[in-house]
Design a protein with these regions (language model features):
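Chitinase-like catalytic core of GlcNAc-active glycosidases
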Residues: 1-41, 50-66, 70-72, 79, ...
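Acidic-and-aromatic substrate-binding clefts and catalytic sites of carbohydrate-active enzymes
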Residues: 20-22, 48-55, 123-128, 150-152
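Catalytic metal-binding/acid-base residues of hydrolase active sites
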Residues: 76-78, 124
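Outer-membrane beta-barrel translocator/channel fold
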Residues: 78-89
Length: 172
C-alpha cells in the first residue's frame, strides 16, 4: 500500500486561515499512477488543522470513489480551540470520525464499491473522544492505528491502554 498525506497541517494559517495545505491534484495523481503500476492500495491521509474532517474528506471525493483508495485521518493535528498545529496534540470526537464514516459509506453505496478502510491514527487517549459512539457500518472498516513515538515499552503500554482497550472495530 502507498500512503500519501493529501492535506498537511501547517504552522501558519495560509490564505484561508485553515492551518493546512492541500496537496496539488497532480501529486495525488502521481501516487495513483504508481499504485496502478504495482496493483497497490492507496491511503490518502488528512491532517485538518483548523478545517474539519467533513471538508477535507469532501475535497478528496474523486479519489475516494476509486476502489483501491482508502482514507486515513490524523487527530494529532486537529486543533479545535484555535491552537497552531504541532503546538499540542489535537483531538477528534466520535462525530468527526462518524463524518468520515458517513461520507465513505455513502460513496461505497452510490458507486457499488468494496468496503473502504478508514485508519484513525492515535497514540494518546485524548486524541479520540467518545470512541464507543463511533459507527460500525458494513461499508467501512475502521482501524484504530497506534502510530506513536518513543521506546518499545512506551509503545506497547500505549497500545494496550488506548488501542487494545478501545478498539472500535480493528486495531493496528
Amino acid at each position: 500500500a502507498l500512503h500519501y498525506i493529501a492535506s498537511t497541517a501547517q504552522p501558519s494559517a495560509g490564505k484561508d486561515g485553515k492551518y493546512r495545505l492541500r496537496m496539488p491534484a497532480q501529486q495525488i495523481d502521481t501516487i495513483l499512477n504508481w499504485a496502478g503500476q504495482i496493483n497497490a492500495l492507496v491511503f490518502v491521509d488528512i491532517q485538518v488543522g483548523h478545517s474539519t474532517v467533513k471538508d477535507e474528506v469532501h475535497s478528496l471525493e474523486k479519489y475516494l470513489q476509486l476502489p483501491n483508495v482508502h482514507l486515513g485521518i490524523d487527530p494529532e493535528f486537529s486543533m479545535k480551540n484555535g491552537e497552531v498545529p504541532g503546538s499540542k496534540i489535537g483531538t477528534f470526537t466520535s462525530d468527526d470520525i462518524n463524518d468520515a464514516i458517513n461520507f465513505l459509506a455513502a460513496l461505497v453505496r452510490k458507486n457499488n464499491l468494496p468496503p473502504k478502510v478508514l485508519v484513525v491514527h492515535r497514540f494518546t487517549q485524548g486524541m479520540v473522544t467518545g470512541y464507543e459512539k463511533i459507527k460500525k457500518v458494513p461499508e467501512v472498516q475502521v482501524v484504530m492505528d497506534m502510530d506513536g513515538f518513543g521506546d518499545k515499552i512506551l509503545k506497547r503500554s500505549t497500545y494496550q491502554r488506548y488501542i487494545y482497550k478501545e478498539p472500535v472495530q480493528f486495531t493496528g
